[in-house]
Amino acid sequence: MASEVEEQIPVREEFFLCGGVETKIIKCGPWTNLFEKQDVSKPKQLIFIIPGNPGYSAFYVPFAKALYTLMKSRFPVWIISHAGFSVTPKDKKVLAAPQEESNAQKIEDVYGLNGQIEHKIAFLRAHVPKDVKLILIGHSVGTYMTLHVMKRVLELPVAHAFLLFPTIERMSESPNGKFATPFLCQFRYLLYATSYLLFKPCPEVIKSFIIQKLMGQMNIKLELPLTDILQPFCLANAAYLGSQEMVQIVKRDDDIIKEFLPKLKFYYGKTDGWCPVKYYEDMKKDFPEGNIYLCEKGIPHAFVLDFSQEMATIVAEWINNRPPRK
């Protein structure tokens, strides 16, 4: 029955200019423009998902739909793509933002870590009215961006921020980071050249076929196209952002956490190569009064591939002010 309900959930893919960059937004629910009167009543809250890297927004659709259903269709759930992680298809239009002036100014180094944070701020200012409360959900490096969005724009009406598998410190020292750092920082240009040679001349229909085969082998059902994952432009930007993560995300920003602690919930994995249990233990020690949880369900860092329903259930319980079932 749940799957039948989720099939009926309206999901749309839209493209906007944000900080001078074409940006994909996936919207779950009947609301398209929160500034305009529509056939449905204006929601009081918006659930806004900031993905990880290379967390292409299409991967988060099952999670968004599950969360939308668990919240009884009361609030829209939106997923923003990172700057440079999507290419607008030829059959799609780049739409005007409700508050266009917020998106007119280009962002310096928009594909880098700082630029990506400013990119999210520009979108929220242009698309979300001040009387709509925000429920921010960050995943992986999206948690780092979430914290810094809150720090830089204090007037944002953030009700809650849920930080899933938070990569907010010592990324290059983590088990995965020790491998990824030399690859992303020293061999990034080799990846650029390889992806350009392999995929630039490749027709879109062939890319779609390759992705369908790969997703089929991984038993992943995609509801929206994912050809961006084989676009050299997008791959290069994902690698560039990753290289900056390894270099810049080092010391945990305790000042931000202290300032917003009552609004924050952290969820760590037991076998997470990006934020190991030691990081969880340090957080619990330094912030004993915080809402900091360690997963007991075996949910992996890349939960969007197989555990969307389980993760959505936990987040829905948080939103409804119930302690999560570990």
From Swiss-Prot:
Q: Which PROSITE patterns match?
A: LIPASE_SER
GO molecular function, a single term: sterol ester esterase activity
User: Which residues carry out catalysis?
Assistant: 140 (nucleophile), 272 (charge relay system), 301 (charge relay system)
> What gene does the UniProt entry assign to this protein?
Ldah
UniProt organism field: Mus musculus
Outcome recorded upon mutating residue 301 to A: No effect on cellular triglyceride accumulation
What is the tissue localization of expression for this protein?
Expressed in liver, adrenal gland, prostate, spleen, kidney, brown and white adipose tissue, testis and to a lesser extent in brain (at protein level). Expressed in peritoneal macrophages and bone marrow-derived macrophages (at protein level). Highly expressed in macrophage and foam cell-rich areas in atherosclerotic lesions (at protein level). mRNA, but no protein, expressed in heart and muscle.
* Phenotype upon gene inactivation: Knockout mice have no obvious defects. Size of adipocytes is normal. Lipid metabolism is normal. Cholesterol ester turnover or hydrolysis in bone marrow macrophages, brown adipose tissue or liver is normal. No defect in body composition, energy expenditure, locomotor activity, water or food intake, respiratory exchange ratio, oxygen consumption, carbon dioxide production or glucose homeostasis.
Q: What is this protein called?
A: Lipid droplet-associated hydrolase
So what does this thing catalyse?
a cholesterol ester + H2O = cholesterol + a fatty acid + H(+)
Q: Which domain of life is it from?
A: Eukaryota
**Keyword Hydrolase carried by entry:** yes
Report the function annotation for this chain: Probable serine lipid hydrolase associated with lipid droplets. Has low cholesterol esterase activity. Appears to lack triglyceride lipase activity. Involved in cholesterol and triglyceride homeostasis; stimulates cellular triglyceride accumulation and cellular cholesterol release. Acts antagonistically with PNPLA2/ATGL in regulation of cellular lipid stores. May regulate triglyceride accumulation indirectly through stimulation of PNPLA2/ATGL ubiquitination and proteasomal degradation. Promotes microtubule-dependent lipid droplet fusion.
PANTHER family (alphabetical): LIPASE (PTHR13390), LIPID DROPLET-ASSOCIATED HYDROLASE (PTHR13390:SF0)
